[in-house]
Amino acid sequence: MSNNGSSPLVLWYNQLGMNDVDRVGGKNASLGEMITNLSGMGVSVPNGFATTADAFNQFLDQSGVNQRIYELLDKTDIDDVTQLAKAGAQIRQWIIDTPFQPELENAVRDAYAQLSADDAHASFAVRSSATAEDMPDASFAGQ
């Protein structure tokens, strides 16, 4: 499920491995790696899909949120924790308030429909998985 022939917006776990951390984050890449390497050993790993970093970047670019972020951060004193907290809250709200572009929404809806097609009562979990979350000098909890 890609965007006009460029990078995919959604990737299935069985398409992923540890070489894909930069595309889908550590948790998603690990789930893909487990499906690939442990399913044949009888370990049950639930199927699923990940939205890609490219999908997120496209969302920010096409909606104009990225420009608003740059403008806000240019005016923010990065040494002032209070200003940073306010800027972070504003950025989160912009992201929450901005609808997905139809292409991304359709990719996620299609993947969800495919995943739930076999079980009308299926349960789902939504997890964050930042592309740099497992680096020793970075924390991206909640991204």
What are these regions (language model features)?
Residues 1-143:
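N-terminal beta-alpha lobe that positions the nucleotide/phosphoryl donor
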